[in-house]
Swiss-Prot record:
GO biological process: dUMP biosynthetic process; dUTP catabolic process
Cofactor(s), names only, from the UniProt record: Mg(2+)
Keywords: Hydrolase, Magnesium, Metal-binding, Nucleotide metabolism
Pathway(s) per entry: Pyrimidine metabolism; dUMP biosynthesis; dUMP from dCTP (dUTP route): step 2/2
Taxonomic lineage: Bacteria, Pseudomonadati, Pseudomonadota, Gammaproteobacteria, Pasteurellales
Designated gene of the protein: dut
Record's function text: This enzyme is involved in nucleotide metabolism: it produces dUMP, the immediate precursor of thymidine nucleotides and it decreases the intracellular concentration of dUTP so that uracil cannot be incorporated into DNA.
The protein's name: Deoxyuridine 5'-triphosphate nucleotidohydrolase
PANTHER family: DEOXYURIDINE 5'-TRIPHOSPHATE NUCLEOTIDOHYDROLASE (PTHR11241:SF0)
UniProt organism field: Haemophilus ducreyi (strain 35000HP / ATCC 700724)
The enzyme's E.C. designation: 3.6.1.23
Gene3D superfamilies: 2.70.40.10
Length: 152
């Protein structure tokens, strides 16, 4: 299913030097977001920096949101993850998409202009209303918390 989302280009290098965010394959869930910076940035070990992507989106549909997620290779190979772990883009947000990059490794990491730094995934949203109850229907798990469902 293809959903049309309004995208505003904030950096005129997009479409000329760097492509619009696109899906790499027909099975890709995420669109790559790039570092639209003026020059390379070295992120020191333990440091967090905020990187512009050069775009903003307006989802408009309250049944959709977007999440900014880390790229698996950056995290596994280099210790580069999102400073806020997951970025949530609400359907009514219209500002620039920024990526909080955290270097959790013990070595500096350099982000070059145009590097793919994160991915944007659109997800369905269900807004809930609460029924106030005094007891829940019993389940086999009950109140079992972390690790309660076992290892196997």
């Amino acid at each position: 299913m293809m959903k049309h989302i309004d995208l505003k280009i904030l950096d005129n290098r997009i479409g000329r030097e760097f492509p619009l965010p696109t899906y790499a394959t027909t099975g890709s869930a995420g669109l790559d977001l790039r570092a639209l910076i003026d020059s390379a940035i070295t992120v020191e070990a333990g440091q967090t920096v905020l990187i512009p992507t050069g775009i903003s989106v307006y989802i408009a549909d309250p049944n959709l949101a977007a999440v900014i997620l880390p790229r698996s290779g950056l995290g596994h190979k280099n210790g580069i993850v999102l400073g806020n772990l997951v970025g949530l883009i609400d359907s009514d947000y219209q500002g620039p998409l920024m990526v909080s990059i955290w270097n959790r490794s013990d070595k500096p990491f350099t982000i070059e202009v145009g590097d793919r730094i994160a991915q944007l995934v659109f997800v369905p949203v269900v807004q809930a209303s609460f029924n106030i109850v005094t007891d829940f229907e019993q389940t086999s798990r009950g109140e079992g918390g972390f690790g309660h469902s076992g290892k196997q």
